[in-house]
Swiss-Prot record:
GO terms for molecular function: rRNA binding; structural constituent of ribosome; tRNA binding. Belongs to the universal ribosomal protein uL5 family. This is Large ribosomal subunit protein uL5. One of its GO terms (biological process) is translation. InterPro entries: Ribosomal_uL5, Ribosomal_uL5_bac-type, Ribosomal_uL5_C, Ribosomal_uL5_CS, Ribosomal_uL5_dom_sf, Ribosomal_uL5_N.
Length: 179
C-alpha cells in the first residue's frame, strides 16, 4: 500500500472532517482518479513517435495508454479527423496512489528551478491540473533511452465541491503549492 494512501486514511481524512466540519464521513473529499495525457502533434508525420510516447507513458503509469484521435479536421494544423494526435491513461485505486506518491516525493523535487505548484490551476470544482514539461523527472524513464523530451498533463480528479476543499486535500497530502 502506498504511503500517501495510508496517510490519507489515517491522518488527512480526520483533519479535513474537522476543518470543514462534515457531518458524514462520505462528505470528506477524496481523490477518485488521475489522468495522464500526452499530446503528440508531430505524430501526423512520424508514426514512431506515438509508439515511443506510449512506451514512456506505460513505464510511468504501469498500464497501457489509449490513443486519442482528432475529432475534426483542422487544415492549419495539418490534421485530419481520426488521425492519432495523443495518448492518455486513467489511473485509479492502487496505481493512482503509487503514481501520486512518486509524483510528490520523487518527481516534483527533481524539477529544475521549481518554485511550487500553481494554486490557481483548480477548475472550480476541486479538481487540479498541472503540466510536466519534461518526462525525465520520473526515475522510471532512463535518460539515455528517451528519443526526445516530451511533456505531459496530469489531472487529479477529486470529490471536493470547491477549490478550497480540493486545495486543502492536496496540501494535506504534501503537494508543494506556492504561498
Amino acid at each position: 500500500m502506498a504511503n500517501l494512501k495510508e496517510r490519507y486514511q489515517n491522518e488527512v481524512a480526520a483533519q479535513l472532517q474537522e476543518q470543514f466540519s462534515y457531518a458524514n464521513v462520505m462528505q470528506i473529499p477524496r481523490i477518485t482518479k488521475v489522468t495522464l495525457n500526452m499530446g503528440i502533434g508531430d505524430a501526423t508525420s512520424d508514426k514512431k513517435l506515438i509508439d515511443n510516447a506510449m512506451g514512456d507513458l506505460e513505464k510511468l503509469s504501469g498500464q497501457r495508454p489509449v490513443i486519442t484521435k482528432a475529432r475534426k479536421s483542422i487544415a492549419g494544423f495539418k490534421v485530419r479527423e481520426g488521425w492519432p494526435i495523443g495518448i492518455k491513461v486513467t489511473l485509479r485505486s492502487e496505481r493512482m496512489w503509487d503514481f501520486l506518491d512518486r509524483l510528490v516525493n520523487i518527481a516534483i523535487p527533481r524539477v529544475r528551478d521549481f518554485r511550487g505548484l500553481n494554486p490557481k490551476s483548480f477548475d472550480g470544482r476541486g479538481n487540479y491540473s498541472m503540466g510536466v514539461r519534461e518526462q525525465i523527472i520520473f526515475p522510471e524513464l532512463e535518460y539515455d533511452k528517451i528519443d526526445r523530451i516530451r511533456g505531459l498533463d496530469v489531472t487529479i480528479t477529486t470529490t471536493a465541491n470547491t477549490d478550497e476543499e480540493g486545495r486543502a486535500l492536496l496540501s494535506a497530502l504534501n503537494f508543494p503549492f506556492k504561498k
